[in-house]
Amino acid sequence: MAEPNDVAAAGAAAIAASFEAYQEERARITRRARERFEKRDWAAGQADARERLDLRDRLVNACVGTVRAELGGAAHDHGLWRAMKELYEARVESRPDREIGQSFFNSVTRRVFVTVGVDPAIEFLAADGPAVREGPVPVYARYRREVSTEALLRTVLRACAFAAPYEDLERDARIAAIELDSHLRELDDGQPIEALELVKAVFYRGKGAYLVGRLRRGRYTTPLVLALVHGERGVVLDAILFTQEDVSIVFSFTRSYFHVEVERPRELVAFLSTLLPLKRVSELYIALGFNKHGKTELYREIARHIAETGEAFVPARGDKGLVMSVFTLPGLDVVFKVIKDEFKPPKQTTRREVMDKYRHVFRHDRAGRLVDAQEFEHLAFPADRFSPEVLRELSEECRGSIEIGRAEISVKHLYAERRVTPLNLFIREADEWTARQAVLDFGRALKDLAATNTFPGDLLLKNFGVTRHGRVIFYDYDELTRVTDCVFRDLPTPSGDDEETSGEPWFYVGQDDVFPEELLPFLGLAGRLREVFLQAHGDLLTARYWRAIQERIREGEIVDIYPYREEQRLVHGYE
């Protein structure tokens, strides 16, 4: 019979080996992004993204099976797992991705024990250890500005050394330098560029490649992103972004995750935090594709906020939904969504179908228009931190998802998302110009979603939101479907007065039929805002528009929605 220490060592070794396999496979998939960009193999890039998203759960599940086999009847021995945690920590302590390894261990323990809340004896509560320091080789390269901004940009573009030619590198460096120098003159702080510190790894996503760094200008730093695309005639510097707002949109929670080679994620996150100080650490890990560890960091941020404030969960702003109970913490820009036990008419979906829709969004190109939702299970919160309104709604409508104790309320399943302002409230409260811009972007959002094969299903304004950057996004997924699964039809012409005045449809309507001409009343737009929408986006109300989108998707066209405005494209602006 094996000694307990031997069993613990075997269990820790099994988890460490699984984590090592995960990181190696993840890195292998990520490395392919460069070749996909160079060869313009966008379909393969999409397949890589899906493969990487599924990878961690697959290996964690396999690891759980291995560990159960190693531990046998002691699989739920708490003392044994405490020893395993110590042994595992020793194995990953010196790794540059130590925090990712700790989250991997936590995932395994939670699958085995189905832990409610957090068990500090067998889980890592935080990536404790020394403060983030630059490794022996920093994650960025430093380029001094010795001659001109144009020469500096020319140098960094050449340093990429893609196995594909630039369409016109000299032109791109010249135009980008004009844009950047003009912006810096407007700052009027008298600080010229001294150097550019650029992350060595290229950030790939969809059809884009991004060089990310910061300009050193005396006591100031300026974020900088060079956005590259690969067209039919070669690689092009498509945009240069140099404000916190524009760079933040590149790393938005409405975007799919980057494929970027990173050996020291904690150090890279620390660097990115200097560019984007308003972004939480959790969001940066998630943007880099370490979404499971990002979820761990998000939980820690939530727990820290609860511990440090006297805030209670309160109902989120907006109309109450039929599918979810939604609440928030006033000082934290996160909403929590719990699926209700029953859905009142006219909803005809099921809990499983709702969860499948969220899973679909997780694996889909979010096009900058779909909120990333982090899925949690078995969380516990202090009972005295729930307002009476939230507690009443959870007790009455989500009883199957919660357990109420004297000290804690445990939630079996919830989604956490970034909090945004519901579009219907935003328009109601905004001035006329701002409301017009929101309506225009609402139409653009519908078109971006359509181009990436997403039809919201329910187009009521309350199901859309506005980010702090003024972008319209969609966050209510229970009726979401693929554009290619819909049948877009023109309304038949009535053949007589009886049909024209009938209060019921006098023609057959299939389950997947959509009549775009009938969508306008559901949008809830009136007066001048209705006119603004119709003038700019009236084509959305025609079946012809949607059928054309379906044809493009079925022909294999892959549309990439870039994280910057059309007018920010460099060649577009100077042709």
UniProtKB/Swiss-Prot annotation:
Provide GO CC annotations from the record.
Answer: cytoplasm
Its GO biological process annotations read: glucose metabolic process; glyoxylate cycle; tricarboxylic acid cycle
**Which reaction is the catalytic activity of this chain?**
L-seryl-[isocitrate dehydrogenase] + ATP = O-phospho-L-seryl-[isocitrate dehydrogenase] + ADP + H(+)
Where, subcellularly, is it found? Answer: Cytoplasm
Disulfide cross-links: none
Which portions of this protein are annotated as coiled-coil regions?
none
Annotated active site: D372
What does the UniProt keyword field contain? ATP-binding, Cytoplasm, Glyoxylate bypass, Hydrolase, Kinase, Nucleotide-binding, Protein phosphatase, Serine/threonine-protein kinase, Transferase, Tricarboxylic acid cycle
State its Enzyme Commission number(s): 2.7.11.5, 3.1.3.-
In which domain of life is the source organism classified?
Bacteria
Q: Which residues bind ATP?
A: A316, R317, G318, D319, K320, G321, L322, K337
Name the Gene Ontology molecular function terms of this record: [isocitrate dehydrogenase (NADP+)] kinase activity; AMP binding; ATP binding; phosphoprotein phosphatase activity; protein serine/threonine kinase activity
Q: Say which family it is in.
A: Belongs to the AceK family.
Entry protein name: Isocitrate dehydrogenase kinase/phosphatase
